[in-house]
Amino acid sequence: MADEEAGGTERMEISAELPQTPQRLASWWDQQVDFYTAFLHHLAQLVPEIYFAEMDPDLEKQEESVQMSIFTPLEWYLFGEDPDICLEKLKHSGAFQLCGRVFKSGETTYSCRDCAIDPTCVLCMDCFQDSVHKNHRYKMHTSTGGGFCDCGDTEAWKTGPFCVNHEPGRAGTIKENSRCPLNEEVIVQARKIFPSVIKYVVEMTIWEEEKELPPELQIREKNERYYCVLFNDEHHSYDHVIYSLQRALDCELAEAQLHTTAIDKEGRRAVKAGAYAACQEAKEDIKSHSENVSQHPLHVEVLHSEIMAHQKFALRLGSWMNKIMSYSSDFRQIFCQACLREEPDSENPCLISRLMLWDAKLYKGARKILHELIFSSFFMEMEYKKLFAMEFVKYYKQLQKEYISDDHDRSISITALSVQMFTVPTLARHLIEEQNVISVITETLLEVLPEYLDRNNKFNFQGYSQDKLGRVYAVICDLKYILISKPTIWTERLRMQFLEGFRSFLKILTCMQGMEEIRRQVGQHIEVDPDWEAAIAIQMQLKNILLMFQEWCACDEELLLVAYKECHKAVMRCSTSFISSSKTVVQSCGHSLETKSYRVSEDLVSIHLPLSRTLAGLHVRLSRLGAVSRLHEFVSFEDFQVEVLVEYPLRCLVLVAQVVAEMWRRNGLSLISQVFYYQDVKCREEMYDKDIIMLQIGASLMDPNKFLLLVLQRYELAEAFNKTISTKDQDLIKQYNTLIEEMLQVLIYIVGERYVPGVGNVTKEEVTMREIIHLLCIEPMPHSAIAKNLPENENNETGLENVINKVATFKKPGVSGHGVYELKDESLKDFNMYFYHYSKTQHSKAEHMQKKRRKQENKDEALPPPPPPEFCPAFSKVINLLNCDIMMYILRTVFERAIDTDSNLWTEGMLQMAFHILALGLLEEKQQLQKAPEEEVTFDFYHKASRLGSSAMNIQMLLEKLKGIPQLEGQKDMITWILQMFDTVKRLREKSCLIVATTSGSESIKNDEITHDKEKAERKRKAEAARLHRQKIMAQMSALQKNFIETHKLMYDNTSEMPGKEDSIMEEESTPAVSDYSRIALGPKRGPSVTEKEVLTCILCQEEQEVKIENNAMVLSACVQKSTALTQHRGKPIELSGEALDPLFMDPDLAYGTYTGSCGHVMHAVCWQKYFEAVQLSSQQRIHVDLFDLESGEYLCPLCKSLCNTVIPIIPLQPQKINSENADALAQLLTLARWIQTVLARISGYNIRHAKGENPIPIFFNQGMGDSTLEFHSILSFGVESSIKYSNSIKEMVILFATTIYRIGLKVPPDERDPRVPMLTWSTCAFTIQAIENLLGDEGKPLFGALQNRQHNGLKALMQFAVAQRITCPQVLIQKHLVRLLSVVLPNIKSEDTPCLLSIDLFHVLVGAVLAFPSLYWDDPVDLQPSSVSSSYNHLYLFHLITMAHMLQILLTVDTGLPLAQVQEDSEEAHSASSFFAEISQYTSGSIGCDIPGWYLWVSLKNGITPYLRCAALFFHYLLGVTPPEELHTNSAEGEYSALCSYLSLPTNLFLLFQEYWDTVRPLLQRWCADPALLNCLKQKNTVVRYPRKRNSLIELPDDYSCLLNQASHFRCPRSADDERKHPVLCLFCGAILCSQNICCQEIVNGEEVGACIFHALHCGAGVCIFLKIRECRVVLVEGKARGCAYPAPYLDEYGETDPGLKRGNPLHLSRERYRKLHLVWQQHCIIEEIARSQETNQMLFGFNWQLL
């Protein structure tokens, strides 16, 4: 590519005709008559030269050239003097009061729920932080890009429109309309320059020619250089484009990726340069290759190099204009004027309109810059914003059509600017009045959807394009924006234009009324489910718009009546087929109704009735205004035809009933989904609720008997009630019963649901409270669940916060879960079992919960309806449904069928509903009688329910009979309540006046209460008797249990573990009394090993087996992992592969360790192998993403599903007992000096033996060791025994586990013969113990009293495995490793690579030395090991030597800069410390100061050595089985130290060790301290590790989440200069912010591409890490390259809930408890486990590509 570029036409020199300096050029321009021509001439000469190298540009040089030769002269010409000085003056002349920041994609925006006019009013981060809204109920969201900060816009905020920086009165701030201090000359120059600049920018941006420039720019000799330019589209994926480029251009992957990234970012890129023919060929190749992978070819053009240059510069010139306009309002106004000016002799529109109309054809980069120009000019000046909006509306239809045909995102379309104009209240009014914008938008909708209209002119979205329809929603959104602020003042013109828009909107609703009609499928099931999503989605989009239109209409009574008339007309027009069709007559109880012969089960029916529902909404608002009485003025009674209005909503409710009755099951899932959404919170407000209201309107205006006849007819139940149906078809009976239930339920809703302002006398707050009460009657709920179940208004508000505390109390969350609201007891009285927003499941659950609660409170289980509020006058006649003849007949029929034992045409649910209707009628009559004299009450429900009439029994008598039916025991309480209510109403009826009636009513109520009290007392007595009976039985069971335990006491004494004790275990396992033995682990006084018979059960085959060394192996499932949990230097460079690594010595900073954890579940080795093979086989057959890496030996524990990658063989502890006489005798002989001499003699002997071999032990001895070789066998004289013989099965498992540790610890292929295998075994033992000790210390738990079962079992198995592992290796190898370890602590021996004392972790040395030491007893002919007494001394002296070395480590690195606050008194330990420190100070040649107080040294030593002692105690306990002192099971810091010393055979004054061994240790001290490497370490104090090591924790996070967002907003990608959307991710281990999921920051690891987070995790956490995605508030756990999972973030809102993705946007604050839990997941090494568990529960066919995170 570079060669081709260089081979093009030679660059032209800048013309000598033009002046060379900016000042002279400015002067020359001033002398020209026509600036535009002169300017273009200048550009024609320079631009192609500057932007010559398009393929590989030198961006810095380009910018420098364009600045010097074009922008600086322009600025000189504009200001007439040095532009830098002028711009600086303008900069300091004051900040503009409008912020105007344009949001980038991914940027955080803030809105205030208290003050914003609507949710589109947002602030940028900086303005928000300095505003009053920070302390309000704000919301945080992530911008999709292209938005605008509204700080300073007084129309956007109710209060606090300005932040501190943009406050008008503040010094340095200027008002919107004030003028910057520009002199007239500058303004004149601007009027010359700006039109020319804008015209050039527009002309070049929309230039279509590929080969030729405009004539005025063709002054150079034309070259033959072209570019093949590839454009971005949304049809092709990244990979498609890369593939096409690789094939067409024959280029490398990296080059293709570079091109693709640039195309995605900028929208286009030159991918080839050269002659026209070559570029044309490349174009055709790219198109053909891209067609192979997609139906659409890529958009490619061949452009002349000069066209490319000018187009690129035009955009750069646009950015320059942006900069200039930011300095002055005058500049902005001149720019706007120039953009809006129409050319006199041209048919073209003004420049800004031309840009708008060309927007859809522009590429991404051009669009962005031009939109920014609009933001920084028109939108910063209110007057010109209005003019721009008028131009926008003028071309609105064309712009939207082009957007719908386009494939680019909405955020980079000119149509996205609508929100900036339509949501400004004054501007919206102006556009409605002057340009009829509502009609424009609605007409646009009709014009873009004609393809979806059927022959009846109704929408039918079958086979719709999801993408296209998704773009249509943008037009619907604009309608919402224009209506979002209701006008407070109505002018005649506004009223007229709004009505015009409303009529236009009704046309859309007419096309939706009855759309997508369906017919019941009979015979066979439908073959293909029809599309239903589009129609429901449009219904959802229109929900708030419908409500807003209704609210706008309700602002003005006249307007509302006219709108009602128009809507009524539209409904009638859609109902012509119903009006003209044939009729049928329905009769019952002497009443008849003539209606259309229509059956929902046979004829066409639609769920979409927006016109009818809008009319219902307008009717309710008429009722609210009290204007229903005027309705006849606009719609005559003859034309009203209420039956027609009721018809379609009633059909819809019948359809729902029949779906419930499974009559439509052959119509498939499509209908079920529609019915679900019809009643769901997202749609119900403008669907289901409005249908109920329309039926209430019908009931209020029709004769009640005729209304019920219509209902019976449509439910197809008229015959079911008129005659007894004799059928044995159980399905048909079930169908009838379901339909009757559904009908009764709807009747309950019509009569009882009055919580709609305008239907009942209620407020919006009362409606919301009732919704909340009924939700919380189901169960306590979190805030988000309540909000999710409440309908939102146009501002996305539910009204929840205003009322929730009146009806519920908040219960705070624990460490997991979320906070919930619980209903207050006083709100329970408002529970209505037949609440119309309950689903079937919710209804059942609520009924169950309330009955259960009443039972617990010893109350009856009756759940009568609460007294309903009064109907509004317009709906007052609805109650006549209750006492009409047909209703009484329906109720009587239901009760009679229930009494008839042969009848099966009733259900208990049906009876419940009938009782509910009875209760409603009685409550209504009772309320009326209590409010008015008896003679004024015409509602006679009691009379009609208690009269006999034509039947033998009245309803009251039927109830008495029902009460005695055993099957209805559950309804007895409700029947009792109704009968009592009958009695109450009867008494009220018997009184002749209101006062007496009220008194009588209260007396009857008192009688009711007495009856209730008696029943309550009876219930309480029964409950108490039952409780005593249970207590008696429990006591008998307890006595039997104790008797059994006493009888079988022996068995219980021998039980090793108490079942069910998961969280902690007791270490004393069937031990003798404390006085029986010594609790000392080391030396001659060592206590006995506590061992027991261990019988374990395999979780796979459930067979038991005793653990013995000669038996087949049993294993624990385990997971080995690399860990940085203890590191003292986070991010220390790591070798990704350990081919050359020597892991014998661990660095003291514990940078990378190998941790072994186990879930504690036991299997036979054979069973595990079979299980693993089965897992491998099933994994090969699965199509899901692999959950684990089988090649690495991974599997899920069969029981707990923890991720494992190996097994630990369970090897029993070999009992060891020391003969006290032998020990005492040996104590006299085996001093430390003698022991060292013996060990050195043995090593020396081995060295001589191997001297002739190939691999001698690489050591050298100090002088004086010559004779020691004669004592080669003397080590055996202190006690030996035969080595343990393990079964082959155990050996195999030992080798397998050791090889796994080696493979994972070093990241190398498995090799069981590698000499480093034993090193890794010792290392994982040491590191695992250190990690567990660190965790216990971090949690403040005792060393032995708080170990979890799995930790206890895992450590026990790990230590015994380590003992056995030595035997599976060549002993010569172990000896070599041992000698290297001993060279650190033995005075007369030093290996060539012996490390400096300060550069090793001595606990690792201790573990390695102890486990390797028995190898010294091995010799060729015999396989021996030390006896118990020998090993007790070996352990004691090794431990003492290494402890002294560690003491020296601590004292050499003591932190002298942090003395303790108070001076401690002198003590023996302090004196010892001072004198010892003075001694070693001499040995280090004064490298450490000796003026540190003794008490400080002693305290530092004690604190520093305690973790080491705790680790040693754990190690020796699990190695030897000696029970530790009781103090180590309790949480006592002071008692712990002395107990540790006692257990480990140490004096509490540790300096006594040196006194005891001084002669032996002194040479060693001198050698250690004189080591040059050690002295060098002491000089580099900043890198030295101090003790105790710091306990790692996750980074400190701010309490307020907005602080983190602020931090992220300032994040700049280290490898990318652009400000495109980034995904800043915070590492919670080290605090680094990374650029995630972006190609710019990908790295190559072992030939594979990995994202920035995965690459960081490899170094920071050895592949395991915790990240916080800042802009999404999501925690992500990752492990390795291909695994990860989401985890609840530690940030909660005030309701105790997380907010992943900031979807709710509530303020978030750090939960310390949650963050602590996350910290423990890390420190317990459970991250891998969490990931595996998450992946197991959330299996996906195609998982997230974690590798590129």
Swiss-Prot record:
Protein name: E3 ubiquitin-protein ligase UBR1
Keyword Acetylation: yes
Gene3D superfamilies referenced in this protein's UniProt entry, alphabetically: 2.10.110.30, 3.30.1390.10, E3 ubiquitin-protein ligase (1.10.10.2670)
Residues found modified as Phosphoserine: 1179
Residues the entry annotates as binding Zn(2+) 2: 99, 112, 115, 124, 127, 133, 136, 149
Region of interest (UBC2-binding region (U2BR)), ranges: 1019-1054
Subunit structure: Interacts with RECQL4.
